[in-house]
Swiss-Prot record:
The lineage of its organism: Bacteria, Pseudomonadati, Pseudomonadota, Alphaproteobacteria, Rhodospirillales. Component of the acetyl coenzyme A carboxylase (ACC) complex. First, biotin carboxylase catalyzes the carboxylation of biotin on its carrier protein (BCCP) and then the CO(2) group is transferred by the carboxyltransferase to acetyl-CoA to form malonyl-CoA. It comes from Rhodospirillum centenum (strain ATCC 51521 / SW). GO terms for biological process: fatty acid biosynthetic process; malonyl-CoA biosynthetic process. InterPro entries: Acetyl_CoA_COase_a_su, ClpP/crotonase-like_dom_sf, COA_CT_C. Its EC number is 2.1.3.15. Keywords: ATP-binding, Cytoplasm, Fatty acid biosynthesis, Fatty acid metabolism, Lipid biosynthesis, Lipid metabolism, Nucleotide-binding, Transferase. Pathway: Lipid metabolism; malonyl-CoA biosynthesis; malonyl-CoA from acetyl-CoA: step 1/1. This is Acetyl-coenzyme A carboxylase carboxyl transferase subunit alpha. One of its GO terms (cellular component) is acetyl-CoA carboxylase complex. Acetyl-CoA carboxylase is a heterohexamer composed of biotin carboxyl carrier protein (AccB), biotin carboxylase (AccC) and two subunits each of ACCase subunit alpha (AccA) and ACCase subunit beta (AccD).
Amino acid sequence: MHFLEFEKPIADLEGKIEELRTLTDGGDINIADEVKKLQEKVDKLLRSTYAKLTPAQKVQVARHPERPHCLDYIQRLITDFTPLAGDRLFAEDRAIVGGLGRFRGRSVVVIGQERGHDTESRVRHNFGMAKPEGYRKAQRLLQLADRFRLPVVTLVDTAGAFPGVSAEERGQAEAIARSIETCLRLKVPLVSAVIGEGGSGGAIAIATADRVLMLEHAIYSVISPEGCASILWRSAANASDAAQALRLTAQDLKELGVIDRVVMEPVGGAHRRREEMIATLGNAIEDALDDLREQDGATLRLNRRQKFLDIGQKGLG
């Protein structure tokens, strides 16, 4: 288990539990009661710690390397998944994963950002930072869903769109804007879930949805705390202050009306009980799709556009 900086007291207790278990392996000493007491302390400390996380600490949790990623959710929730590749214009971008499959009995199109789980996969998926061809692939899948009247589920987990020169040369800003436009034009249900880090336009490109769900300890912001601090304070050392000012937590964004539902995580974060988290998000997605099922295409499109116009009006007000 990878422990975060603020989890040191929890790590110390779990280390003691592991030591006791190691000492008694193969021996006759019974210390079950002591282990049970320590485990109860760990559980209590986890609850108290995660009940009062600061925005900066939530940023750490959202970026936890053992947190379930896009492909983990697809593998557990989507059956008969058939991935589709390429944007039919330039290249394949593995930062965006997408395809057709079945979600709890209904055919869907799934699109998500995959960060990778080890060095090799992170490089292969470019750490979840999509290039223009990735967003154009997403547009192709969105249009396919619209053509065949299939609901769309998107899974958001990115630090942002890839900022390299090559991406700018191929029209990164246009690709993001066109993805947002494509989302707004859809006449099928579109449900988006922010499962980790939702970074700026790179996230909203596939999150302009009828229902935006967000995990309890995920973050969603126009800029990273480090980037914001570098601009405002000329130093990334003020990232904690920036995280507070950005109001990037699920709780703040629900209050602001930017997201529709906060999906609760297991005690200690999604990385501690991955299977439980995946099932919980699956239930939330199912609820959202059921809620949208009876709306016709014109109503879906009108309500979706109005929803995001209202968010803009609130910001101007």
